[in-house]
Curated annotation (Swiss-Prot):
Gene Ontology BP annotations: DNA integration; DNA repair
Domain Resolvase/invertase-type recombinase catalytic: 1-140
DNA-binding region: 168-187
UniProt xrefs under CDD domains: HTH_Hin_like (cd00569), SR_ResInv (cd03768)
Homology family: Belongs to the site-specific recombinase resolvase family.
Name of this protein: Protein uvp1
Origin species: Escherichia coli
UniProt keywords, alphabetically: DNA damage, DNA integration, DNA invertase, DNA recombination, DNA repair, DNA-binding, Plasmid
One Pfam family from the record: Resolvase
Function: Cooperates with the mucAB genes in the DNA repair process. Could be a resolvase-invertase protein.
Record-annotated active site: S9 (o-(5'-phospho-dna)-serine intermediate)
GO MF terms, alphabetically ordered: DNA binding; DNA strand exchange activity
Entry-linked InterPro entries: Homeodomain-like_sf, Recombinase_CS, Resolv_N, Resolvase-like_N_sf, Resolvase_HTH_dom, SSR_resolvase
Length: 198
């Protein structure tokens, strides 16, 4: 039996294209699901339809996906899954990545697999970053690092630097920041002070 699995991991994705390609590949049954960010674990609560799909597969069956990254999870989970399929006598096909473990030269296929693993992990990281930034923007956060000094810290720093005996290095050490950070806060806007750089 040829079984397909389609997955979308963001609200911007649609499984229609994946399902169409799986149907063209001869899939008799297709499992598909939406994976929410944060559900990166393949089994248990992360991808129940993938789990159902894997349970349905029998020796001699074929699992078809549009692309390797549709299996989700981490790179190590994908490698483990592919190894498990091989041990169970199940053929694996990833249409977009041109992977077909039924091909006669298995060694070449695994070499090809290893070549695309790095691209797979890079794409997963990009997707996670974009999803995280979109979620942060939705909560009103625009990203970037939190300021290293509060308004109270800046005021105290300016008072300390007004003392001619106080050095930038000493103030930086007191606030656990770099000297460059001290310069940045003392030269912002129209405010510029002569400070002791010793």
């Amino acid at each position: 039996m040829i079984i397909g699995y389609a997955r979308k991991s963001t609200h911007l994705q649609d499984v229609t294209h994946q399902v169409d390609e799986l149907t063209k590949a001869g899939c008799e049954q297709i499992y598909h699901e939406q994976i929410s960010r944060g559900g990166s674990k393949r089994a248990k609560n992360g991808a129940p339809e993938l789990e159902n799909c894997l349970k349905a597969l029998r020796e001699g069956d074929t699992l078809v996906v549009w692309a390797l990254d549709r299996l989700g999870g981490s790179l190590s989970q994908v490698i483990t899954l592919l190894d498990d399929l091989k041990k169970r006598g199940i053929t694996f096909i990833a249409i977009k990545d041109r992977i077909d473990t039924s091909a006669p030269v298995i060694g070449e296929i695994y070499t090809h697999l290893m070549a695309i693993f790095s691209n797979f992990e890079r794409n997963r990281n990009i997707e996670r970053t974009r999803s995280g930034l979109a979620a942060a923007r939705a909560r009103g956060r625009v990203g970037g690092r939190k300021p290293s000094l509060s308004e109270d810290d800046i005021n105290e720093m300016k008072i300390l630097l007004a003392d001619p005996e106080m050095t930038v290095g000493a103030v930086a050490k007191r606030f656990n920041v770099s000297r460059m950070t001290i310069y940045r806060y003392t030269t912002k806007g129209n405010h510029s002070e002569k400070i002791n750089d010793e």
